[in-house]
Amino acid sequence: MSEDDTKLMAPPSSFTPELQSESPKSAQISYRFMCPGPGRFQCSSTGLVFVMAQKTELVYKAIQWNESVLQPSGKIPAGLLFKIQCPEDAVCQLHLPHCETKDAEFLKSLLSVVHITDDGMSILKPLEITDTHVIVTVSHFSAFGIVRAFEVFYRFFSNPCPVHGQVLLFLRPPNLNSQRQNLHLVVLSRNVPLEEVRRRHQDSVYIPAPLKCLLFEDQHYTVDCPTAFIVQPKKADFDLDFGPNYHPTFEIRLSTSIKVVTIALRDQKNTDVWKHDVDLTGPGPEGNHIFRHGL
């Protein structure tokens, strides 16, 4: 076995891509990676894994789905649609992250990958589906994305399984006149990259917190926050949302004097599926508000 073959079979090496945007306030970003040579490389921002055959430059970005193109094929989005640019034959395989918790046998009938070019759309049968990724063989690039088989999904809807979800927190600048601040909760599937959401909330401060939870599609959720003046809406359905806007799922209104707040996301049975004590203060010794530190 050659050295290059060994690299192609090795676990992926993580890399942090260079982020590029059209302007400082642009919500559209591209990811750039100078691949050093053959091997497996995983993007720390998107979760994508590229199995590379050669040294090259990779440039990729998430673009908006056109669901009217998918509908005739009986497919619905199950992940972001990525437009990828690189030389032909530079990539052997592409691993796209999914959010499913179902077993591998079921996923074989549920998930596939679409390849969209200027000539139209083709559906690729996965080479393999792991607990985290859908793997396809590729040779040339344009746009790739994971899709679900609509008929298969709703055939088993009476006995649903959860998907891997995440809760992202964004604190709006305080209103000094009313002495109020708004904390936004964005509830999404696990395979939506954080950076894609952050770019849609550039006027807010992202608050790191444990992200992971299990969520059921088309079921409603509520937020409990005892120190809030108001939480709105009172309940919200969870749907797979792959952008491009990523609006807040819940808004929590708080006094600016609040430094720490406990938030719980609850399901229809009033069971906590996610709970966290959120620190709304900055790193200074007096715990000044994070906006006063310019973070």
Regions found by a protein language model. Give the residues of each.
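A structural signal for beta-rich interaction modules in eukaryotic proteins
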Residues: 1-111, 115-295
